[in-house]
């Protein structure tokens, strides 16, 4: 079995920044709270809660409130500043830029965002601008629109959505902006190419992670693909595949990927009788 690990793996800079900041605050002995997953990865969240991070939607007691990488609605942010002595905004800079862009364009045209309506990033965005969030093309009466995208969406799926919207409607002015994170686009392109040479693609990342799900869908077009959160989820028959490729979402730590590769080698060794 040949194991090929993608070049673009591990945390993106926004996730790394968020986790590092929370760990530093906890190491300082501060009582840190938040209202949801800092990042969409179960193992990372377990590690942070073990260190003392408190997660609750009802939490009002603490020294420091940390805003998740996905952001929160503007009004909610202002409320939190009145409740907590310190609020640390860990919204990914690329996500923050999306919010500002939506807010600016909403003054002159209708904002249509390609994304998951219930995703935390989209919930936060609607706190900055009255946007329509959907992944399904629809008929629309407004003549002036701007198209934006959730930062973790597939670029190709976003383009297909916009093309369908233009075919279905008669817009007088339609602005198309690529607001997808370039880090996720690079991973998307690598998975698109590398999965073509794989007998099995393994995508490692949280099951609630939008960008990990995107990579799973892309790899599935070209090879047998599984999506796992931990090495324990590797199926016994993984050793029957000739070339196995390993990919990861942007919320997946390098240590987890290393553990998956180690487990694959152990499974291969047991099959060959070398372990």
UniProtKB/Swiss-Prot annotation:
Amino acids binding [4Fe-4S] cluster: 12, 92, 181
Residues annotated to bind (2E)-4-hydroxy-3-methylbut-2-enyl diphosphate: 40, 70, 119, 151, 209-211, 251
Protein's recorded name: 4-hydroxy-3-methylbut-2-enyl diphosphate reductase
Pathway note: Isoprenoid biosynthesis; dimethylallyl diphosphate biosynthesis; dimethylallyl diphosphate from (2E)-4-hydroxy-3-methylbutenyl diphosphate: step 1/1; Isoprenoid biosynthesis; isopentenyl diphosphate biosynthesis via DXP pathway; isopentenyl diphosphate from 1-deoxy-D-xylulose 5-phosphate: step 6/6
Pfam families: LYTB
Cofactor annotation comment: Binds 1 [4Fe-4S] cluster per subunit.
Residues that hold dimethylallyl diphosphate according to the record: 40, 70, 119, 209-211, 251
Bridged cysteine pairs (disulfide): none
Keyword Metal-binding on entry: yes
Top enzyme class: oxidoreductase
Cofactor: [4Fe-4S] cluster
Catalyzed reactions: isopentenyl diphosphate + 2 oxidized [2Fe-2S]-[ferredoxin] + H2O = (2E)-4-hydroxy-3-methylbut-2-enyl diphosphate + 2 reduced [2Fe-2S]-[ferredoxin] + 2 H(+); dimethylallyl diphosphate + 2 oxidized [2Fe-2S]-[ferredoxin] + H2O = (2E)-4-hydroxy-3-methylbut-2-enyl diphosphate + 2 reduced [2Fe-2S]-[ferredoxin] + 2 H(+)
Purpose: Catalyzes the conversion of 1-hydroxy-2-methyl-2-(E)-butenyl 4-diphosphate (HMBPP) into a mixture of isopentenyl diphosphate (IPP) and dimethylallyl diphosphate (DMAPP). Acts in the terminal step of the DOXP/MEP pathway for isoprenoid precursor biosynthesis.
EC number: 1.17.7.4
Alphabetical keyword list: 4Fe-4S, Iron, Iron-sulfur, Isoprene biosynthesis, Metal-binding, Oxidoreductase
